[in-house]
């Protein structure tokens, strides 16, 4: 199925100046937030191979990955807030923490405008997602 076959669009925006491992880490963490918030409707059934071994289910729809500068990530966060589109976020400070409560403390320590964003993910209706993501280019 294509992105347009779904009522919603799922997207990750990652900062372009990150190391490869950081980009992957950010994508993994922020998409977990989208999946948790979306609930069972966004997750498919278990995978089963030809030998009957079971594997965990995945999201049922494609995930679009975009690249952006730090300033553009701030713009994306602001647009999402204005349109009341829930987002998952990852900040640079979170690279130096080791657990969830420390991650939340890192985010709580900064005003929204001062967050050093390195990644954002969202799942929203196409129209809202397109408005929030306007002007971004797909990750190479």
PLM region spans:
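Positively charged, small/polar-rich N-terminal and surface patches that mediate targeting and assembly
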Residues: 1-140
